[in-house]
Regions:
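Enzyme catalytic cores with a strong preference for nitrogen-chemistry domains
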Residues: 1-153
Length: 153
């Protein structure tokens, strides 16, 4: 989570230079992993018109496959993510955006990444607090995979 910038940047997350540097880092990591046959998950802030999102970028063979946005932001104890970040609302549809030199990148929570060579392998992502709520994004992922991936027998 937020491995590009670090989790404790506080109000520096509002600085455009930090946001641009994080986006450029994704582009550079994509270029450097072009020959790597592994999914790479990278945490970073993503600035959009409506706010800044705590996200995970997913890379494979030099391509940005998706940007997962965190929905549930902790605001207790030492956590105050709602000060800097906007939650991606459950009722928001997946958007397709341009980011880090890539076009039509899925941005949201309800994103499934399917292996082109093995349709029985499907991956999704959720970030930290999203896992610990009563109905996490992964519950929707599992339901969708069950509906989409049921083998014909």
């Amino acid at each position: 989570e937020l491995c590009i910038t670090g989790y404790t940047c506080g109000d520096l997350f509002f600085q455009r230079s930090l946001q641009v540097s994080a986006e450029n880092a994704v582009k550079e990591i994509a270029e450097r992993t072009e020959n790597l046959k592994a999914l790479v998950f990278i945490g970073l802030p993503v600035a959009r018109t409506e706010g800044i999102y705590n996200c995970a970028a997913v890379l494979f063979e030099g391509k940005l496959l998706a940007l997962y946005a965190k929905s549930y932001l902790p605001n207790y104890g030492e956590f105050y993510e709602r000060r800097q970040f906007t939650p991606f609302q459950q009722n928001m549809e997946t958007q397709f955006i341009s980011f880090a030199g890539f076009d039509d990148v899925p941005f949201g929570t309800d994103i499934l990444i399917q292996d082109e060579k093995n349709p029985y392998v499907t991956v999704a992502c959720e970030l930290c607090e999203d896992l610990w709520v009563p109905v996490p994004p992964s519950s929707r992922h599992v339901l969708a995979i069950g509906l989409v991936q049921k083998p014909n027998r």
